[in-house]
Amino acid sequence: MKDLVKFLKAQSKTSEDFDVIKIGLASPDMIRSWSFGEVKKPETINYRTFKPERDGLFCARIFGPVKDYECLCGKYKRLKHRGVICEKCGVEVTQTKVRRERMGHIELASPVAHIWFLKSLPSRIGLLLDMPLRDIERVLYFEMYIVTEPGMTDLERGQLLTEEQYLDAEDRWQDEFEAKMGAEAIQDLLKGMDLEAECEKLREELQETNSETKRKKITKRLKLLEAFVQSGNKPEWMVMTVLPVLPPDLRPLVPLDGGRFATSDLNDLYRRVINRNNRLKRLLDLIAPDIIVRNEKRMLQESVDALLDNGRRGRAITGSNRRPLKSLADMIKGKQGRFRQNLLGKRVDYSGRSVITVGPYLHLHQCGLPKKMALELFRPFIYAKLESRGYATTIKAAKKMVEREDAIVWDILAEVIREHPILLNRAPTLHRLGIQAFEPILIEGKAIQLHPLVCAAFNADFDGDQMAVHVPLTLEAQLEARALMMSTNNVLSPANGDPIIVPSQDVVLGLYYMTREKVNGKGEGMLLQDPREAEKAYRTGEAELHSRVKVRITEYVKNEAGEFDAKTTLTDTTIGRAILWMIAPKGMPYSLFNQTLGKKAISKLINEAYRRLGLKEAVMFADQIMYTGFAYAARSGSSVGIDDMEIPAKKYEIISAAEEEVAEIQEQFQSGLVTAGERYNKVIDIWAAANERVAKAMMENLSQEEVINREGNPEKQASFNSIFMMADSGARGSAAQIRQLAGMRGLMARPDGSIIETPITANFREGLNVLQYFISTHGARKGLADTALKTANSGYLTRRLVDVAQDLVIVEDDCGTHEGLVMTPLIEGGDEKVPLRELVLGRVAAEDILKPGTEEVLIPRNTLLDEKLCDVLDANSVDSVKVRSVVTCDTDFGVCAKCYGRDLARGHLINQGEAVGVIAAQSIGEPGTQLTMRTFHIGGAASAAAKESSVQVKNTGTVHLMNAKFVTNDESKLVLTSRNTELTITDAFGRTKEHYKVPYGAVLSKGDGQEVTAGETIANWDPHTMPVVSEVSGFVKFVDIIDGLTVTRQTDELTGLSSIVVQDVGERATAGKDLRPTIKLVDANGNDIFLPETDVLAQYFLPGKAIVSLDDGTAVKVGEPLARIPQESVGTKDITGGLPRVADLFEARKPKEPAILAEISGIVSFGKETKGKRRLLITPAEGETYEEMIPKWRQLNVFEGEMVQRGDVISDGAETPHDILRLRGVRAVTEYIVNEVQDVYRLQGVKINDKHIEVIVRQMLRKAVITKAYDSEFLEGEQVEVARVKIVNRQREAEGKPPVEFERELLGITKASLATESFISAASFQETTRVLTEAAVAGKRDELRGLKENVIVGRLIPAGTGFAYHQNRHKHRLVDDVVAKLSEEDEAAIADEFVITADDATQNLATLLNSEIED
């Protein structure tokens, strides 16, 4: 019993028992304390005896015996001698495995600088000594002397001397001073540093300096020095005097046949170090000439550098085959390094893989497992059963039986497998649905059978895909597999909450076919008493599947008590729909079935079943749908023949008409009326339009057929053409593909993306000629190349996303914040793109939601908005809701359940411990391969569409103008004088229906608050020029408008009108450089006019290229244009689309020419211009004027005297998220990133919930920059985790001190991953060397909070089921302390009292511990 208690004590001290991992610099003493002896010789093993040489790199005396419990000379063998040290060979008798953990060391004859701290930028040694890296290297590699002790001379400490200077100084001062070279000199300098004093000095300098660069430099150095002071690392440890030697079994030497050896590169590197070190020792003993010693020291330094990080400095040392040797640093970094290959990417035992095939008869929770495979995978279980049943006496006998495949073995296998779930995985596992659990059904054959409905989740098809099988061994693993990973528990997609168990292809076609209706089918108009009779009529051939009939349908509706009430009605339907109703579960409405079912409708069916009836019913229903779909797809006999591709008769006339138009344009081009570019664009437009018309004619032709109904009249019905049915049902193919089969192929692109102007007029049914085929090949090949690139890029994006979000877990229920995001429906132009309910469904309300126009609370705050509550919102026409969001969540490390809302894959509020970060990363990364890689070129049709010039309303309602300023002209229309004006149309309930952006100078026929009717045009503007609108009436007075100097006159040849064009500053003669052409408005007497209600003069500066068509002294009225500024035609600007755009957003990259935003609110004016820039001034109501230089070529959005708000756009361009964050705050930047990312995904038709993108944004925002530190631990300008600052501020508040002030900072995902608190996670991501160097110098602690760190140290992750485990661990920590306090006597007493088995002991211990906890 005593042993047992000891054993239990020892057990509790396992790997579980730490919470923090600290990294630091190793001191020489520490390295010696690890070591078991000094390696003195470079020899490895004796080539004859294969025994390790004494004192060599594989020495048994230092590292341990080569054979288990046997010393080298063979004097002591076997277990009884364990722990004895042989007096002959000095080897300890113990297990061989100590050779994996015992280290040795090498005493270096001269100190050597550690290359990581020297060369990894920024150089730590350089920063500490405040010397440039070049100088340090000169000293280290023996090119220059450095003064280490100036004494009474006028040399400085740390001054560099060349050989001559050194000799001169020696002549002058003899031994008053000390100067050295090599690592010793650096070591002396580092030893001599007084860190505390240096810190003080730097702090004072920081107070005094004003220059930003100096400040940054000092802060950097100060941070490093403070890190040294706090971590207890000593600077001189960055120079090594002792080198540790890795245990020999970690750098093995293996004899190959033929007397050669295979060895790890490290042995070569170590050998090199030892050789040079020994030679240096000898030279020092011989007191050799300085120059030789120096050379040897330099070589030693180089060989140690190569051992630690080969190739970082100079040429990499290569082995016999010219490839660089793999150094210690290479062992841990990169995809093949320790972190990613062995710690994060372990391989799994008990697994097999095979090809997959269809199992259409399986249930959703089953899969077919080949018997051969099952026998192999469940081997240990079978052995155990055979023994316990007494069929086999030993394991060996059991093994024989299994190998013979006795009959009894198969019976036992069936027993073992029963209710033992197995995991199936299909690579690439892009989201968590790529691994699911199933119950195996034993089958003959060698292929795994997979249920067709889970194919969508695995993205599997049966064209030769393979899948891997894994067996969960422990009870806990089986439990998890069954309760969490079973395919029946994964009906909804975690990305968007829609069902992912959706039928596709055959099943969809079958259901579509059986729910279609046909005019005048056999048996039309029958009256049937129930669906069973309908089926009978169909089976006996009395009625067709599609005939319209009346059937009595019984629906079941839930009442208040939750029981079903039957409700029977006579319904107009078809035979097929009535038959389908037979598989519908109770509680579903018949209306969902009484329609032609396409893929979307079927998806809705399953969704409704899940929401109304719960998981079990929905799963059974999905299975039934599948069986029925397959059956009726077979019955339909759909097939594709060449005659199904009907070419429309109109095609040829459409094409010839287009050809005529093209010829006409060609003539115009040749007579010089249109430019080459215009011709090209017009030709492409013509062909694109022709293609559309052919496609339309073809679809009309295909999609309908005319039939005679019962009354004998012709009636149109949807066609039963096989190709059309496949596309219409959503089973396979699309209108675009049918267009290529039966319409025309249309325009093709060249490899560079530009469009070839001669289209392919043929389709695939007619066949392509040689030229057409050749043009097609471009696109096809580009598609293949794109796909290959896309996969790699998409995978890398996913990896970065996972890495940045991996430590985000739900850690508490409610953080109590009132913050949130205000959601409004997304409306672009006249249509609602995303309705409000889609945005708020599954979120938690942050504030009470009131009934519009009243104070009545519809939904109290902190309520999860589910489908029913969203219906309430719709019914009350609520148009904006403030919901909780992860971005505004107040939890320190992690997020709270209320801020996250619904778990999309389960449909209820999310559980604690759910790893929402990883789910978000997978949801965004998984569809990555569906996004395009291209950047789109706007050419032809697209560029024409981009120029809108009016707003035509689609809904009747009320006009609202946002940030609008306008003047009323004499036709009493409004002329806008403000930029970025937004115009919205709201309905009677105040819901926004349409949303437009209206430019400056647009003429509006309706004002704010006025009613409009649908179809009315309420705004017009010229898309090609931007007017300068007069805001007062008066007479024009030209200032600085001098012909030939600042302006030129141009006369139009056709009209004879003359106009004045302002010259660009760059084109003017020197005399006109400083003149600023201006139109001033004066009254009849020539006095200045001020703008109404201001003291700003009515004068308008004209930029270059402005066109003035008025003359000096002309009278103008309010709202008339004074001048026109031509808008540069956008030409073909590429839009970055698809995957690269998403990556740019998440990396928070700054665009090439970012928009310029107003830094403060105030009045705009312009100061003196320089050659290429203008000076923009913003004067606020109070405070300093802000000025900024803006290049001339930037088009400005503001005029002199205009009022701007902070964050308004001053000059066009792509907005930078960093600016949005700085000027408009966290919510604005979240909204921006979410919307931009969603735009890309929406374009591809991929649905992702906003939550996931917000999760990533939260991680991008987790750092802050300290702006005011007061007396806290932070430095100003330092980058720290927001959570850290929050914690410190809470303490300061409690102590009554002012809180530390900070600004949030937006980091791209790669930067954010590398800047995480956990150095283990960062090191395993990228730039391993840099991360580890930084962490070691700072003496960082890793709290093991994230998932990745815990996987690396080999524990359960603190998420999911591991979340509870880690919480319990912390509880048990307290208990273990209690057990540890038991004294020896108590233990003895316990031992006397009980004589019990180990199992009982564990049980007793458990009760003991529980009682302790309760106490």
Curated annotation (Swiss-Prot):
HAMAP family linked: RNApol_bact_RpoC
EC number: 2.7.7.6
Gene Ontology, cellular component aspect: DNA-directed RNA polymerase complex
Cofactor: Mg(2+); Zn(2+)
Classification of source organism: Bacteria, Pseudomonadati, Pseudomonadota, Gammaproteobacteria, Pasteurellales
Family from the record: Belongs to the RNA polymerase beta' chain family.
Role played: DNA-dependent RNA polymerase catalyzes the transcription of DNA into RNA using the four ribonucleoside triphosphates as substrates.
Source organism: Haemophilus influenzae (strain ATCC 51907 / DSM 11121 / KW20 / Rd)
Name the record gives this protein: DNA-directed RNA polymerase subunit beta'
Binding annotation for Zn(2+) 2: 815, 889, 896, 899
